[in-house]
Amino acid sequence: MGKYFGTDGFRGKAGVDLTAEHAFQVGRFLGWYYSRKHAEDSARIVIGKDTRRSSYMFENALAAGITSSGADAYLLHVTTTPCVSYITRTENFDCGVMISASHNPFYDNGIKLMNGVGEKMDDALQAELEAFIDGDPAYLPWATEGKVGKTIDFYSGRNRYIGYLTSLPSRSFEKHKVGLDCANGSSWMIGRAVFDALGAKTYVINDQPDGVNINTDCGSTHIEGLQLYVREHHLDVGFAFDGDADRCLAVDERGQVLNGDKIMYICAKHFKERGQLPSNTLVTTIMSNFGLYKALDKAGIRYEKTAVGDRYVYENMKENDFMIGGEQSGHIIFRKYAHTGDGLITALMLMQVMIDTQLPLSVLAAGVTMYPQVLKNVRVDDKDLTLADAAVQAAVEECTAELGDSGRVLLRKSGTEPVLRVMAEAGTAEECEKQVDHIIAAMEKSGHLIEVKK
């Protein structure tokens, strides 16, 4: 991870950690970098944004930087991250840029970069961009006269994405009552358009963005509102998206939440039964629930475990030609249809399973039972030394042996905070607490523990 760009782009508090000047510099660099590859025409860079007030500021700054370096900036305006990915790869853009901080509060924002096929930008290019931001910007030439780039409204790209989504399901959603929680974010128009076009009776909440209400007590991080709405309106299913709609969680007809693990299980099992799961493998991260692996074993489905982050899930899928992978949080990638997590595609795939099987979501999810989980964040004097400590390693081994096939423990470094994450899954919450506390006690005895964070 670099100074500015992490696993999910350049993110921070708007106007503090991420400023309009940063956005302008990103645009300047991208415009210059891709213009070098075009001798006869202009480089083309497509930009999307979510509904945060600061997204409009960053959109203008990016476009100014891009055009000042001689490239053309195409503006999708408010749209989803997966829409930018789709349009980048299908409309032959040099790269795509999404302005969003995903599920974060409105006062944060971010810049996500994608390569010409809609994948996350490679680390080497982002490192070069960081060096430019911290270096002397004067060495890049300014475009002049007829070389100055154009800024082009590209609403039609968003409409093409909607058309693509509506082409994916093989059956109508007629007679299905579907609730959508759009988190006052990027999906607020697209979600309704897609489900209405597919014949669903669509009920939409949190589709009134005002620039500051994105993710506020709504969407996939506050799904309780959708749970209540599904029960009160007797809906068949509900889907909750985050601010840029690259993740999706579901609510069944009883108002119960299905996280990413349950959604992946349902889809993988259905596709396997239809001979549509290449290599019979699902890609997960190390944070997926122990219950998912138990259910996959029973269903005869193999699985891979990657580091936390949809970037690592996608890399594994691409390298091994796997088709379904994702995270418990609802970042799920269907690689046949997208090169990034797409909340709307996830919702469409789950609808397809419901319609194919003619079963309610509660029945489809019954095959997997989530194990209780306890996770504690622990500040230590040195993360690496603590992980290597013999007493701590012995405690982990003792917990693993005691749980056997009925649970697991996991000790890992946080990628974003100065803490270690201690997690246990077992048959009861009490058993989880016992195992986690045993590992923390070993840290304390070895002199590494500073505090257990609340």
Language-model segments: what does each one mean?
Residues 48-50, 180-182, 252, 336, ...:
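Short glycine-centered, acidic/aromatic-flanked micro-motifs in structured strand/loop junctions
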Residues 237, 274-454:
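Phosphate-binding and adjacent anionic-ligand microenvironments
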Residues 1-64, 68-69, 148-178:
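An N-terminal, well-structured beta->alpha segment
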Residues 44-108, 193-251:
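N-terminal small/polar loop signature for handling phosphorylated ligands or for N-terminal nucleophile
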Residues 5-6, 47, 73-78, 98-99, ...:
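General beta-strand structural signal in soluble alpha/beta enzymes
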Residues 13, 109-233:
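Gly/Ser/Thr-enriched, mixed-charge loops and adjacent short helices
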Residues 8, 47, 84, 97, ...:
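Buried hydrophobic positions in well-ordered alpha/beta secondary-structure cores of metabolic enzymes
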